[in-house]
A protein has these predicted regions:
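Perimembrane helix-loop-helix junctions
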Residues: 2-4, 150-156, 170, 183-215, ...
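Membrane-lumen/periplasm interface segments of specific transmembrane helices
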Residues: 34, 44, 180, 205-287, ...
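Membrane-interface alpha helices of multi-pass inner-membrane proteins
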Residues: 117-118, 162-178, 185-188, 314-316
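Short acidic/glycine- and proline-prone juxtamembrane loop motifs at membrane-interface regions
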Residues: 39-40, 132-140, 325-326
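Loop-to-helix entry region of an early transmembrane alpha helix in multi-pass inner-membrane enzymes
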Residues: 65, 69, 73, 81-99, ...
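Membrane-embedded, lumen/periplasm-facing catalytic core of multi-pass transferases
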Residues: 357-426
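Transmembrane-helix signature of polytopic, membrane-embedded enzymes
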Residues: 13-18, 104-125, 142, 161, ...
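Hydrophobic, aromatic-rich transmembrane alpha-helices
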Residues: 99-105, 265-301, 315
Length: 426
């Protein structure tokens, strides 16, 4: 007999989720035809790419930018192939996202509904929005979730080739986003946990060898800290820590969790109800986060140990990250979705189950609106120019689309933005 609860595996809503999934596939493919969606970080990637390809002054911002080169390598490849246009950017992002979700589903396939899992991730406003941007999130998701899949298979099958694949995917994820160091750390912890008996015996018998290996690793980290951007990251963070004290960062993180689980950016509400809206998002995020952490780390469940370690390490980074943007959770949001679905299936508390059911309805409605609005703006250039990146590049987009600004507040334009649009838009 099928479950009546829409969030449980085997639910009678399975066919509905299947229909929603294929509708979302159509939406994501339709977004391939969007104009080039620029973001401040997108412009940095294009600047770094052109600096590498065509050269730039050694003291320019592009030459000294600390972004890792993993995503820039993709842009350079597309440039070499002559396909560096908005269509190719969104299409490869779609492939990255769907491929990454497939990898992760294989880890949780015995405990969660496939179409529900895909729908929850694909309907989240963060993915609806940023899959259409030239940003590194989707590439990171593909390689990080691929690394998780291969490591999980290694645990099950004990084949060294799978471990090598996991490390390769993890390394590419790290080269794409430096936060991938949390994944490498989780794999290391997972190996220690999986072979803890053998390693304790090896450690007792080879103390000097282990000490030498650790010393080499530390030395390598020091030597390569500059080319990997670690030094620059440290300097940037130390400056921003002064601007974002601890409790301010904590408030940001819980507000971001509220934005993820309500499935809408908080500014949409804060603009209307001021501080009350912000506090509501923080409160909801705090409640969901506490439930999540308690159920994941302090109650019995079958979530793989290394995935728990990965999420813990990622949270340690995030709760010390001196910037405010829910996009920073995108790399682990699919993992969060899979964990929530599995934990919810074992949830006995009726109040928690009811609360998540209500939240799920709100989530679906707001996600559907976000997906529809995204397609609408992709095919309406006037609205696109006015709303993309909150209108920051409105004048540049209007010049690109219509040959002149359409707004009477236009003052000055950014020549690099116009250059990127003229050269790399579809």
């Amino acid at each position: 007999m099928q479950s009546q609860n829409p969030l449980l595996p085997g639910s009678r809503y399975s066919n509905f989720y299947k229909l929603v999934f294929f509708s979302l596939v159509a939406v994501y493919l339709a977004d391939c035809f969007t104009p080039l969606r620029l973001h401040v970080d997108s412009l940095r990637y294009y600047a770094i790419m052109e600096c590498i390809r065509y050269g730039c002054p050694a003291d320019s911002s592009a030459a000294t930018d600390y972004f890792p080169y993993g995503y820039t390598a993709l842009l350079l490849l597309f440039l070499k192939l002559g396909i560096l246009k908005s269509f190719a950017i969104v299409f490869i992002n779609d492939i990255y996202l769907f491929g990454g979700l497939f990898f992760l589903y294989q880890v949780f396939r015995k405990t969660i509904s496939p179409f529900l899992f895909f729908v929850i991730v694909l309907l989240n406003w963060i993915f609806v929005k940023f899959v259409a941007h030239p940003l590194s999130e989707m590439q990171y998701i593909f390689f990080s979730l691929g690394s998780i899949f291969f490591f999980y298979q290694f645990i099950l099958r004990k084949k060294i080739q799978l471990l090598v694949l996991s490390l390769v995917f993890g390394w590419v994820a790290f080269l794409t986003r430096t936060v991938g160091i949390t994944l490498i750390g989780a794999i290391a912890v997972g190996l220690i946990w999986e072979f803890r008996v053998q390693q304790l015996a090896f450690l007792r018998n080879n103390k000097l060898l282990v000490g030498g290996i650790l010393a080499i690793l530390i030395a390598a980290l020091i030597v390569f800290s500059k080319p990997l951007g670690i030094n620059h990251y440290g300097n940037v963070l130390s400056e921003h820590f002064k601007e974002a004290p601890f409790f301010k960062r904590i408030g940001w993180r819980f507000k971001e969790w509220g934005e993820i689980f309500v499935n809408t950016p908080s500014n949409k509400f804060i603009d209307y109800v001021a501080k009350a809206g912000e506090f509501a998002f923080i409160a909801l995020g705090l409640i969901v986060f506490c439930w999540f952490v308690y159920r994941l780390y302090f109650s019995k469940n079958s979530i793989p140990f290394f995935i728990k370690a990965y999420f813990l390490f990622y949270c340690l980074i995030m709760f010390n990250w001196p910037f405010n943007d829910p996009r920073f959770w995108a790399p682990v949001m699919p993992v969060m979705a899979a964990i929530v679905l599995q934990l919810y299936a074992d949830e006995k508390n009726k109040i928690s189950r009811l609360a998540f059911s209500v939240l799920f309805i709100v989530y679906m409605l707001l996600g559907s609106f976000a997906a529809s609005y995204m397609v609408y703006t992709s095919f309406n250039k006037k609205v696109f120019a006015r709303t993309q990146a909150k209108g920051v590049f409105r004048t540049e987009y209007e010049i690109h689309f219509f040959g002149k600004p359409l707004n009477d507040t236009a003052t000055q334009t950014d020549p690099f933005v116009i250059h990127v649009l003229q050269k790399y838009d579809r």
